[in-house]
Design a protein with these regions (language model features):
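Basic nucleic-acid-binding alpha-helical/helix-turn surface characteristic of O6-alkylguanine DNA
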Residues: 1-80, 86-223
Length: 223
C-alpha cells in the first residue's frame, strides 16, 4: 500500500471513531478522504479487512458495552445514534454474540461454554454462546487461571461451563482456514507504527521466512 492510501485509511478510521455517535454514511466518510464510495470501500476493505460499515459496528458495539453498565437500552441506543433498541439488539448479537439485556445484567440467563486450546499465537481462552464467540484471549500458561477468573468477573450472572470438546470445534474453525481467500475479521487497536508492522506481517506469504530488516524496510523504517 502507498503512503497516500495509508494516510487515507488512517484519516477515515479517525473520522469514524470521532463521529460514531451519529453513524455517518459511507458517502460522507468517502468525501472526507476525497474518494468515490466505490473506490473508498475497496481501499478500506483491502487495508482493514472489513468494510467501513462493519468497522463502525465494532466501534459502536464497544461503546454500547460501556453505556449499558449504567444506562437503559433505549437511552444507549439514542446516544449511539441508533434509531431503536431493536437495532442495538441486532448489533450486539452480531458483534458480541450477546443481547443488550444480557450484557447489562452481567449475563443473567446466559450460558457461556469455555475452553483453553493451543493456537498459532500461544494458548487461547475462548468463550462461546449459542450465538457465537463472546471471548477470545491469548494467554501464557501462567495467566490461564487468571483469564478464567476474569471471564467470570466480566459475566458474574452467567452460567460458565468448561467444554473443551465443543470449544475445540470453534477454535479449529477460526484458525485452520485452508481455503484460498478465507479470512478472519480482526479489529486491531494500536499506534500507527504498530498497525504498519502488523499489516506487513499479514502480507508475508504462508511458509515464507523473513527478517526484521525486511519488515522494517517494507514499512519505510529501515533499521
Amino acid at each position: 500500500m502507498s503512503s497516500v492510501d495509508y494516510a487515507r485509511v488512517e484519516k477515515a478510521i479517525r473520522f469514524l471513531d470521532e463521529n460514531a455517535g451519529r453513524q455517518p454514511e459511507l458517502r460522507e466518510v468517502a468525501e472526507q478522504v476525497g474518494m468515490s464510495e466505490f473506490h473508498f470501500q475497496r481501499l478500506f476493505r483491502r487495508w482493514a479487512g472489513v468494510s467501513p460499515k462493519r468497522f463502525l459496528q465494532f466501534i459502536t458495539s464497544k461503546r454500547a458495552g460501556e453505556l449499558l453498565t449504567h444506562r437503559s437500552a433505549l437511552d444507549a441506543s439514542y446516544e449511539l445514534g441508533l434509531s431503536s433498541p431493536s437495532r442495538l439488539h441486532d448489533l450486539m448479537v452480531s458483534v458480541n454474540a450477546v443481547t443488550p439485556g444480557e450484557m447489562r445484567s452481567g449475563g443473567a440467563g446466559l450460558e457461556i461454554r469455555w475452553g483453553v486450546h493451543p493456537a498459532p499465537f500461544g494458548d487461547c481462552l475462548i468463550g462461546i454462546t449459542d450465538r457465537g464467540v463472546c471471548e477470545l484471549t491469548f494467554l501464557s500458561e501462567e495467566e490461564l487461571r487468571e483469564g478464567v477468573e476474569e471471564l467470570a468477573r466480566r459475566w458474574p450472572a452467567a452460567t460458565l461451563l468448561e467444554d473443551q470438546r465443543g470449544t475445540a470445534q470453534m477454535v479449529e474453525k477460526i484458525f485452520n482456514r485452508r481455503q484460498a481467500g478465507d479470512h478472519v475479521e480482526v479489529l486491531l487497536g494500536g499506534t500507527n507504527f504498530q498497525l504498519q508492522v502488523w499489516r506487513a506481517l499479514l502480507e508475508i506469504p504462508t511458509g515464507q521466512v523473513t527478517s526484521y530488516g525486511d519488515i522494517a524496510r517494507s514499512i519505510g523504517s529501515p533499521l
